[in-house]
Amino acid sequence: MFEFTRMDALVSERFTSNNRFVDILGHCGVSMLSEYLSKGNLEKAAVAGSGFIKQADLHDQDDVKPQNKFSAAAKLSYALQMAELIAALHDYPHGKIVHNDIQLSQFLFDQSGMLKFNDFNRAEIMLWDEQKQDYCRYRNGPGGGNNRAPEEYYDKPVNEKIDVFSFGNGVYGLLTGLWPFYELDEDHETEMQEKLKRGETPFVDPRYHNRSFEEGILVDIMNATWAYDPDDRPDMISLVTKLRLAKLEMDKHVSKHS
């Protein structure tokens, strides 16, 4: 408990100059005081229901039916904000930081509706190998839950690419309003983990790709983040670049037709 709180406070303190991170006000022992945000988190808005449903109950024969009320533009905007915040950790100038627990619930809304990043108690500040001139991979212990990358369930050495995989799961929630493997509820957690270990990825209705420009971009990004081999996944900086370019294109289209 002490180490979790210490890490949460340490990472929060390092980013006090970034107003997109929840601001730490104080820390002592196993307690941390941070700014109060009353607008809820992204998970409750993106996955408004249970997030689990049987395929037949979607009634989507004629068209896909996202289970949230986000517009395509909002989905792209939130995905970009999430990516920028994760990238800030990975690109920290004094050493790469892995969040280690990327979920939609870690992104809180401020008064203006922008996202603020939160909850760094599982963060890992990666060590640097002078001989190899690279960051050292580390072990987390066997992963729990269903938001993790395949290598975590095998307890293999991991790096920041576990955050990339979990970011893809967050994008899935934005896109569909559902959890990955939405037909398997929490009682089937082991079954979900076995699917991920085998390299299976959640079903993405192909109609999402052509539903809108924004959603097509998100499908492409999601599929890239779910590469089984972590070395084949894009880094967060390249994802931020792609999302920013997509948002510029989206804004240009809106301006042209307004």
Task: Give residue ranges: language-model regions.
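Catalytic-loop of the protein kinase fold
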Residues: 90-110
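Conserved structural core of kinase catalytic domains
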Residues: 23-71
